[in-house]
């Protein structure tokens, strides 16, 4: 059975780079949890544009502001919402090289563990 992968993208004010970050993994993962923590820039607009283009792959949530204590709770909620075998953390300004994401996905899909 093929292993499935979710990308966790928990962001705030990453409108300048987040499109590139998500696009760098979108064709290699089954789902992207794209949660915004109170952006005041164009991050949410970018998220909705990506969701329009990939409606079944993007789960966008306006999570709301987090602080040092509640950041870990948001991450845990992302884990709880993940229904795939694996997940990767994707920062809002993290752009994967094609070869790198292909290598990671290959390792995941060829691993014996779930």
Named regions from a protein language model:
Residues 99-114:
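Conserved donor NDP-sugar-binding/catalytic core segment of glycosyltransferases
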Residues 2-6:
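Extreme N-terminal starter segment of soluble prokaryotic enzymes
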Residues 49-55:
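Short, conserved SAM-binding/catalytic segment
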Residues 9-34:
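Short, well-formed alpha-helical segments that are part of the catalytic scaffolds
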Residues 91-95:
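The conserved acidic donor/metal-binding loop of glycosyltransferases
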Residues 35-49, 65:
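A conserved acidic beta->alpha catalytic loop
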Residues 87:
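Short aromatic/hydrophobic "clamp" motif used to bind/position activated sugar donors
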Residues 65-81:
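Glycine-rich, basic loop-to-helix element that forms the pyrophosphate-binding segment
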């Amino acid at each position: 059975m093929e292993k499935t992968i979710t990308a966790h993208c928990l962001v705030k004010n990453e409108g300048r780079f987040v499109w590139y970050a998500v696009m760098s993994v979108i064709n290699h993962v089954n789902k992207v949890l794209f949660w915004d923590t109170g952006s005041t820039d164009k991050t949410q607009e970018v998220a909705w544009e990506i969701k329009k283009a990939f409606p079944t792959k993007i789960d966008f949530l306006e999570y709301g502001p987090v602080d040092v204590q509640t950041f870990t709770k948001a991450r845990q909620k992302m884990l709880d919402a993940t229904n795939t075998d694996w997940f990767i953390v994707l920062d809002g300004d993290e752009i994967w090289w094609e070869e790198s994401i292909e290598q990671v996905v290959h390792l995941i899909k060829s691993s014996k563990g779930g």
